[in-house]
UniProtKB/Swiss-Prot annotation:
The lineage of its organism: Bacteria, Pseudomonadati, Pseudomonadota, Gammaproteobacteria, Pseudomonadales. This is UDP-3-O-acyl-N-acetylglucosamine deacetylase. The gene is lpxC. Belongs to the LpxC family. The active site is at H264 (proton donor). Catalyzes the hydrolysis of UDP-3-O-myristoyl-N-acetylglucosamine to form UDP-3-O-myristoylglucosamine and acetate, the committed step in lipid A biosynthesis. GO terms for cellular component: membrane. One of its GO terms (molecular function) is metal ion binding. It is an enzyme of class 3 (hydrolase). Zn(2+) binds at H78, H237, D241. It comes from the Bacteria. HAMAP family: LpxC. Keywords: Hydrolase, Lipid A biosynthesis, Lipid biosynthesis, Lipid metabolism, Metal-binding, Zinc. SUPFAM superfamilies: Ribosomal protein S5 domain 2-like. Pathway: Glycolipid biosynthesis; lipid IV(A) biosynthesis; lipid IV(A) from (3R)-3-hydroxytetradecanoyl-[acyl-carrier-protein] and UDP-N-acetyl-alpha-D-glucosamine: step 2/6.
């Protein structure tokens, strides 16, 4: 049986929020079977818990934000991407502020934290959502699609008319039956343009952003001294974001996601369209792990 998975131990980290610039303490804790990923604002009294579910997404400007009443948790996508990539079904994420720390702008530090805490299999079958037929959403020239696929695959294309992007790969497709999330995707950092930063800061966004936690691009070049981690790091980060956004379904996915210039808003719209179309998906479990199409979820393939 493919079993649900949580953390073996509690682990903590400190960082700053990308958009708020606030210092934040992060604690990842094990959680019981069928809990899902739950964000907990421990700076509030009483503590407010917000499950990482598509229907709890309230804002999608520059990041994915979970909302419950007037309480928010910003920038959940990179941590959720790491949870998805390592197959963590159940965990509590405690935060001392309203935003998940940006760390280095990728999912790599979260992968390291989760692996350091250890993975614990639980005595219940892991539930997967299997895509049964195509579901798509569009907005202008942007598009996001789910299609049936016997495994988990994410394809993405970006289209930036900019000197830094013109000579680089702007399309990537990652089939996780043959590709390691940790090695090939998790280290891709978020990116931003110098020309946008002043405006973003006037909107109280990107207040914690720097070359320490993002790829910063000016009119002609990448400003980070060390350059890029992957030749296709820009589009790989969009894949990382999409994996985090898709994990708001609450379960690992069996199917393919295709995005063209899609962002957090359209990704969430796609999840809501899928959930509403009950004939387009089903929940499945695997009594025999050998029959499962997703191998990267198993502990040996997680590293």
């Amino acid at each position: 049986m493919i079993k649900q998975r949580t953390l073996k131990n509690i682990i903590r980290a400190t960082g700053v929020g990308l958009h708020s610039g606030e210092k934040v303490y992060l604690t990842l804790k094990p959680a019981p079977v069928d809990t899902g990923i739950v964000f907990c604002r421990t700076d509030l009294d009483p503590v407010v818990e917000i499950p990482a579910r598509a229907e709890n997404v309230g804002e999608t400007t520059m990041s994915t934000t979970l909302v419950k009443g007037d309480v928010k948790v910003d920038t959940v996508e990179h941590l959720l991407s790491a949870m998805a990539g390592l197959g963590i079904d159940n965990a509590y994420v405690e935060l001392s502020a309203s935003e998940v720390p940006i760390m280095d702008g990728s999912a790599g530090p979260f992968v390291f934290l989760i692996q350091s805490a250890g993975l614990q299999e639980q005595e219940a079958a892991k539930k997967f959502i299997r895509i049964k037929r195509e579901v798509s959403v569009e907005e202008g020239d942007k598009r996001a699609v789910f299609v049936p696929f016997d495994g988990f695959k994410v394809s993405f294309e970006i289209d930036f008319d900019h000197p830094v992007f013109r000579g680089r790969t702007q399309q990537a497709s990652v089939d996780f039956s043959s590709t390691s999330f940790v090695k090939e995707v998790s280290r891709a950092r978020t990116f931003g343009f110098m020309r946008d930063i002043e405006y973003l800061r006037s909107q109280n966004l990107a207040l914690g952003g720097s070359v320490e936690n993002a790829i910063v691009v000016d009119e002609n070049r990448v400003l980070n001294e060390d350059g890029l981690r992957y030749e296709d790091e820009f589009v790989k980060h969009k894949i990382l974001d999409a994996i985090g956004d898709l994990y708001l379904l609450g379960n690992s996915l069996i199917g393919e996601f295709r995005g063209f210039k899609s962002g957090h808003a359209l990704n969430n719209q796609l999840l809501r369209s899928l959930i509403a179309d009950r004939d387009a998906w089903e929940v499945v479990t695997f009594e025999d792990a050998r029959t499962a199409p997703i191998s990267y979820m198993r502990p040996a393939a997680a590293v």
